Amino acid sequence: MWLARRTVAGARGLADITEMRLDPTYRRLTADTRLADGSRRVYLHHIRKSAGTSLMMSFLALGGEDPMDVWARINSRRLARTTSGPYAFASIHRKLLAEGAYLFGRAHRPAEEQPLPPDTCTVTVLRDPVARVRSYYDYLVVGDAIDSPGQVAPKERKLAADGFDAFLDRVPPPHLLTQLHTFSTRLDVTEATERIAACSVVFSTEGFARGLGDLATQLDLPLEMHRARVTGTRSEVTEGQLDRLRTMVAPEYEMLRRLAAEGIGGPELPTG
């Protein structure tokens, strides 16, 4: 059984590589791409509940379509890519993102596990750690809109099934400290700080409008504000629960303080 699964996975991987390299559409669209900053593509280190989806929508709208329609097409395809107007977009697929035939790509994958080609503008958006975890909890409680692509899994929603304290007991460290884990799977503050500092562009959820405007200027692209996956529900938490959460996410605050000391992340970057 194990060998059969590995054989199927290997065959699927080979088929993916063949399709990526033989389909001329994406290479044709991106062959001559050169953005204003000299890069050939943009890759987002996408941290959940930090406005990464909103940033993605700003790019997916460039072709003139409703960005939700573009996102739905990406999610419906095995290779998680599509085109819109003269632009190519890619998501999630490790090899596809490594190939580089897209204007904008993104994944939640840790940075150390995602190879990227040269001349890639790397972007990440950071958020106040307590606010991000609270937003993540509210998101699990409420779930996605019925027509939203990329629905959160029912198993993951169960993390928030019995209140905030139970959620803090259950949530795995990579989900609790997602910002740190994205840049260090060992959850090492120094390693994560160094990797974030190496990104081309870093800004915060709190300074999103300014960050998006600066990015649009840097790339010379007409990026406009698109809000997505904004959870309207705000769960009640006690001061004691907030204190507990602040203690649990202390490594992320330390990471943000180090970044701020180096002038990274913009003036709105929260440091605790």
Regions inferred by a protein language model and the residue ranges of each:
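Aromatic-acidic/polar surface patches that form glycan- and anion
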Residues: 37-38, 45-48, 115, 192, ...
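A residue-level signal for conserved active-site and pocket-lining positions in enzyme catalytic cores
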Residues: 51, 128, 200-203, 215, ...
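Membrane-proximal basic amphipathic "stem/tether" segments
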Residues: 1-41, 84-91
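Short, solvent-exposed loop/turn segments at secondary-structure junctions
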Residues: 48-52, 62, 110-112, 128-132, ...
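Hydrophobic residues on the short alpha-helix immediately C-terminal to a glycine-rich phosphate/catalytic loop
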Residues: 58-59, 180-181, 259
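PAPS-dependent sulfotransferase catalytic core
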Residues: 29, 106-109, 223-272
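PAPS-dependent sulfotransferase catalytic domain
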Residues: 29-30, 69, 76-125, 131-224
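N-terminal pre-catalytic "stem/leader" segment of glycosyltransferase-like enzymes
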Residues: 37-84
